[in-house]
């Protein structure tokens, strides 16, 4: 990479693919940004490419995805994607490095004291470990989102209130370590590339409380109840699998001409949002005051 006032700089990753596309005229570099983080220098390119919308080539297939903490995702097909828990596995080393950094001579703005070399080295190790955890989490989400988009024409996800869920101090770290918002972002832009659809279920749709067999909605469902037992038809099923099947049923039972519909907690029909290849979402916001009623359930959801 040739940078202004610096010259030619070797990169760790190969840039031959980008160079070939630029030489062929199928890509044009608009800008390059050099940044420093986790003890390493990075250069990122903003490239303009021509990407045409692709029509779905797969047979019609709908999959519901229920994200959680115990399992990363449960699909309506019955597949359970385990949660790798990268952050939990690195906590022991992070705490050890934190105690080690506390014993080093750090900076002091009052006296103008500079940090010691060992303090800088310890914090660089902490930054590299955090970067490793973030990269491992992002890599797992990329693999899952790519597999779902390539094997299904419609992916149904929930409009989760992640900002409200992390207010639960007991589950905040576990929820943040899953990357629910990042998963939805990846699925949406990858579906736009391949011509698939992403259906975003309404935030107030009771997917966990609704029986996937008969459609009856339970009044209460505690977080400790991992098995959903319907009092109407007697069906017994894992609560996460039940929620995933309900999400898939939103699209399977809807009409393409009028858009997918679902039921509010009170039973009234409401419009869901479908993100197509253009990335445009349609629908209406939740009713006024519903956030306070559903905040307790959303903050303890897994």
Name each model feature, range by range:
Residues 46, 100-127, 135:
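Long, charged amphipathic helices and adjacent flexible linkers at domain junctions
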Residues 69-71, 162, 243:
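Short, glycine/acidic-enriched loop or turn micro-motifs at the edges of active sites
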Residues 43-55, 127-151:
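Phosphate-interacting basic helix/loop segments used at nucleotide- and nucleic-acid interfaces
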Residues 65-66, 148, 155, 187, ...:
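Short, conserved catalytic/metal-binding motifs centered on acidic residues
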